[in-house]
Amino acid sequence: MPHPLLPDLETLATKVAASKGFALCGIQLLTHMSPMTLEVQIRHSSGADVSLDDCAGFSGVLGDALEASTLLTDAYVLEISSPGIGDQLSSDRDFETFRGFPVEVHHRDKDDSEQRLEGLLLERDADTLQINIRGRIKRIARDCVIGVRLTSPGS
C-alpha cells in the first residue's frame, strides 16, 4: 500500500519538474529507512540525457519546495536520479542507439498469434523492424510489433 503522502508528493514533484524542463518518471517514499528517503527519478522533457548537474540542480529546487510545503515534517533524505536505461525500446532514439544489440521481439504473425524472436537489432523504419537471426534478416511489419526489449547475449 503506498504511503498516504505519496500522491501529494508526486503532485508537487511533477509541478517543480515541469517548471524546470523535466518530467517526473518515478517517485518513492521509503519510510523504513532512517531517516526516511524520498527517491525521485526525472528525465528531460526534450528527451536529452540527464546529467549529474541536472540532478543536483533539481535537488535544490525540489528540496526548497518540499520545505515550503511542510509535507514531510520528519527528517528525510532526498535522492534525485534519472531512470537510466530500461530494457524496453520505444523511441526512435532507442532503436538508433541499440542497433546491433541483442533483442527479443514480441509480435503478432499473419495468423494473429503472438510470437517471440531473438536476434540482433538491425533497423526500424516507418514500415518494418529488421533483426538478424543467425545471419538471416527477418523483417517484421511495424504494426505487428507488440514490444522490443534488450536481452543479454546468449540469454
Curated annotation (Swiss-Prot):
GO terms for cellular component: cytosol. One of its GO terms (biological process) is ribosomal small subunit assembly. Keywords: Cytoplasm, Ribosome biogenesis. InterPro entries: Ribosome_maturation_RimP, RimP_C_sf, RimP_N, RimP_N_sf. It comes from the Bacteria. Pfam families: RimP_N (PF02576). It is found in: Cytoplasm. PANTHER family: RIBOSOME MATURATION FACTOR RIMP. Required for maturation of 30S ribosomal subunits. Belongs to the RimP family. HAMAP family: RimP. This is Ribosome maturation factor RimP. It comes from Synechococcus sp. (strain CC9605).
